[in-house]
Every structure is written in C-alpha cells, then in structure tokens.
Swiss-Prot record:
InterPro entries: Ribosomal_eL20, Ribosomal_eL20_dom. GO terms for molecular function: large ribosomal subunit rRNA binding; structural constituent of ribosome. Keywords: Ribonucleoprotein, Ribosomal protein, RNA-binding, rRNA-binding. This is Large ribosomal subunit protein eL20. The keyword Ribonucleoprotein applies. The lineage of its organism: Archaea, Methanobacteriati, Methanobacteriota, Thermococci, Thermococcales. Belongs to the eukaryotic ribosomal protein eL20 family. One of its GO terms (cellular component) is ribosome. Part of the 50S ribosomal subunit. Binds 23S rRNA. GO terms for biological process: translation.
Length: 77
C-alpha cells in the first residue's frame, strides 16, 4: 500500500457562522482522510460531526501540497 496526499475542502458551522476550510493530509484511503477531518476540526473547534460538511476529497501530487509539513514528508520518501 502506498501513502497518498489528499486535499479536503469543506465548511463547518460554529454558532451562526459558517467557516470554509481546506486541509491536506497523508493517508492510505480517502475514508481515512474523512475521519481525520472530523476528528481534527471537531476537537480543535468543538464542532459536532453533523456540523462539518466535506465538499471534496481529491488526491494530489506531493509537489502540489501547500502545507510544508505534508509536502516535506511526502517528498522525502
């Protein structure tokens, strides 16, 4: 199995405010990325999973990653 880089776009609602987000993760499957998003945003912003809407999960090349940590980890291997 190969670890891939994914970019996730979506929206979460905190109170009356809807906040867009874009995150990048390294994972084996898109399902793992989905779980990471729910876990990280829910924990950091105290938002329940029902208030987090994932619009897209796309696989990207490691060179396209904007997050320097994700890019560096992906390119070193």
């Amino acid at each position: 199995m190969e670890v891939k880089v994914y970019r996730v776009k979506g929206i979460f609602q905190r109170g009356k405010l809807k906040q867009p987000f874009t995150k990048e993760y390294r994972a084996l499957k898109p399902e793992h990325v989905e779980e990471l998003v729910y876990s990280e945003i829910g924990s950091k912003h105290r938002v329940p999973r029902t208030k987090i809407w994932i619009e897209s999960i796309e696989e990207i090349k490691p060179e396209e990653a904007e997050n320097p940590v994700v890019r560096r980890l992906s390119l070193e291997l």
